[in-house]
Curated annotation (Swiss-Prot):
One of its GO terms (cellular component) is endoplasmic reticulum lumen. Disulfide bonds join C22-C177. GO terms for molecular function: auxin binding; zinc ion binding. Glycans are attached at N117. InterPro entries: Auxin-bd, RmlC-like_jellyroll, RmlC_Cupin_sf. This is Auxin-binding protein T85. Residues 1-20 form the signal peptide.
Length: 187
């Protein structure tokens, strides 16, 4: 009996190691979003889940996130060299956006109100920020990005020169699992 218990424990430990946060081995094809791990990565007011991604799941063309922002919280002012699509699931907020241009800094952003069932896209390298303006309700969004893993350039404010923006790579949710091995195209 004790021998069987040891075998079962060994199998469970091996399976747990195989299905670690940084491995696609052992992950089921169909998963329940509410059972996926959520983290704030040291950013107060944020809850982030990578539903399907480059670093965690081996995706090459797109990455999908579920993000929840507490009332008053926001993303940093930032840009990245990928396209981004948002679907607002609940809550309300403001999208601040400056189109990429040949100016030396982002400048004054345009404001767009976002609300449940609204969707918007961020073109490549457009500086933007999403802000939860709701007083009592979380802002929850489903986000799809192209060309993962994301390389983010962060700004202190809208007048900071593009050349002074700080690169954050790997991004917070990719830090633990990112490996410096090069990604190879299928060709």
């Amino acid at each position: 009996m004790a021998r069987h218990v040891l075998v079962v424990v060994a199998v469970l430990l091996f399976a747990t190691a195989e299905a670690s946060q940084c491995s696609i081995n052992g992950l089921p094809l169909v998963r329940n979003i509410s059972e996926l791990p959520q983290e704030n990565y040291g950013r107060s007011g944020l809850s982030h889940t990578t539903i399907a991604g480059s670093v965690l799941h081996g995706m090459k063309e797109i990455e999908v996130w579920l993000q929840t922002f507490a009332p008053g919280s926001r993303t940093p002012i930032h840009r990245h060299s990928c396209e981004e699509i948002f679907v607002v699931l609940k809550g309300q907020g403001i999208l601040y956006l400056t189109p990429s241009s040949h100016s030396k800094y982002p400048g004054n952003p345009q404001e767009f109100h976002i609300f449940p069932n609204s969707t918007f896209h961020i073109p490549v390298n457009d500086v933007h920020q999403v802000w939860n303006t709701g007083e009592h309700e979380d802002l929850q969004v489903l986000v799809v990005i192209s060309r993962p893993p994301v390389k983010v350039f962060m700004y202190d404010d809208w007048s900071m020169p593009h050349t002074a923006a700080k690169l954050k790579f790997p991004y917070y949710w990719d830090e633990e699992c990112y490996q410096t091995t090069s990604w190879k195209d299928e060709l």
